[in-house]
């Protein structure tokens, strides 16, 4: 989540009556064994393909006085290596994107660039009609999709989330939803949602958007969407817009899942709240259904999705509630998907069971079904409140769940009632390619007052990463084992307290947010600490402690951290996609505040392309 959206939503949240979040945050666990750590075996530890060089030995006949001329050995083509060999870059506060020596960075798509045919940003404020065709603002999650008949390492589709407007290129002054005109609302809403662009690599190795492609399309806060699934009857028949599109994911059948990280429309509060806070399924190829809000996956502040599938094509979708605190969920489809018929999967996400994770003190966990009539989800239920952020016991709040639709619409409360564990702001989730591990970033929770094994720090300013393993590596499992993978922080912050130090080996960071395991099993983490931010030590800002937000590789065995990329002034690093050969990485730079990406112009959120200059895989 961008700190900008936190600020934008604050007045709206403050005006609402609130229920303190869940007593089931592991407070019952803390007495059991607060120092617990479980060591899980990892089946994807530093996978690499090493270069193989061969040599032929020429054998001559000892009785032959003349040695035959050996046949020349062709120079072997080096095998691509995916070992992590880049030289770590230093933490810094430069107003540029810093990458290791031997790498290059190009800007692919800036806020205000054209997606659909029209006039791009040129320094003047646009009309809503103009901005509807532009790339929106605050680029966030994204996915790369292959195109039939196109070499996927040289071209394809990129679907990109736009979380929040880059208001500096839209209008003069600040935006106030309470007093905004219809035109101002339309302008603000034009800059959120997603964009799909066809991209291609040129002969010079640089990537560009293919202008005029039939795939280039905007889906905005002004567009129309439908709802489907068990709670669709509680939503409007036609929904205006989606917004706060934070991170994202994909399905095995090639659709894009974009996540609404807000349960209200804070840019236009006249819209019904129930219409927002959903996972929206969009087909980037424009072959299947219209963009659809899938209510079976629950309504909360969604961050991203990540799927696990087995050999029988059964699939689970993992999700985190970006709240302080929030729960971790999975949705299990009730049938196998079709790998040969995309159209047969059109309603896969409407039928299945939503579960919430419960973390036990002994290193085990279980999935609690969020089904009406089960786990306390009935009329006369009791929401336990959140003693994790209060040392004073809270009175439970009565809540009624009359049917499954109400369970899904009121998912945040239902998860606590069902016994889900509330965590320190679960953001991105990633699943190992062989299903052997799942990682979740818990970005931070400065409000935590009671510790426990899964959330072990009071005033958790810097966050941590948790790892769990499904029984049998199965998406259908009802139990799992877990461990804390690492705690963010830095030893030089020890004067502010032990909870600021962390246990990172190598390059330190704060507030892990984006996380992704690439197809070769390499774990990448992106950070989102607020700027200037509180490091926990008086007189030291968070940028002074850690440098600008950055992207890291973390070895899953040694847990050694290496800083790969550092962003420009004021930005968050978010979003990661790549070509199949991993020679091109796409990364988003969100809300820069300095003089980037174009000197002398307004700062703009942008998608960048990171490549090696020798055309080898990124990371080597």
Stretch-by-stretch model annotation:
Residues 1-38, 49-52:
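N-terminal secretory signal peptides
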Residues 20-33, 42-45, 71-620:
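Conserved small-residue
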